[in-house]
Amino acid sequence: YKNTDKASLYANDDGVHQFAVAPSGSADSAINWTTAMIIDNAGIVRKTYQPAFSANAVETNNVPINTWQTVNLTEIFDNNADFNPSTDAFTAPVGGKYQLNGSIRVDNLQEASGYMYIRINTSNRGYYSIVSPPAFDSTPQYWSLVINHLADMDAGDTATLSFYIAGGTVGADIHSESIF
């Protein structure tokens, strides 16, 4: 160990390259290595703790109109424990660029609604996409709003998915096929 939390190990076995890291310990103590990256003979790179998550929406009926609604989510997978289902938020573990994608399936929307937004809201800014139901010739049974953005996030910044519907007399429904 050169410094605290600076232990690293490289191993090569039958052409498979393995990179491991560990917090420092004391002399003669066991080291608990964590495999950070593996590169196999085919050149396939695996980063076990690379931040990645997927969550689908909890079906929500009659979403309130004229107010932002954070989409309630259920975790599908979370590689690095960076998604918190109790807050419906992803937290960036380190500073960097993060590809964030969201899709909301809206059911029972009204032609009388003024417009609908989907937003990925990060600690630094919000990213929006909009659609205007009055442009339809009739009331659609369902509609999908999609947003994709490469966001610059600092360590500890959060990202959530939200929805807004303006006007109309009743809110639409967020279907469980919606994802973040």
What are these regions (language model features)?
Residues Y1-A27, P51, S113-Y115:
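Self-maturation zones of extracellular/virion spikes and adhesins
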Residues Q18, Y117-N121, T160:
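Beta-strand signatures of extracellular beta-sandwich domains
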Residues F19, I39-N41, R46-K47:
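Extracellular beta-strand solenoids
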Residues N32, S123-S132:
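Surface-exposed loop/edge segments in extracytoplasmic proteins
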Residues I44-A112, V131-F136, T169-F180:
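Terminal (often C-terminal
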Residues E111-R125:
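Short, surface-exposed beta-strand/strand-loop-strand elements in extracellular ectodomains
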Residues T139-T158:
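Short, surface-exposed tryptophan/glycine-enriched loops
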Residues S162-T169:
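Short beta-strand-plus-loop segments that form exposed binding edges in beta-rich domains
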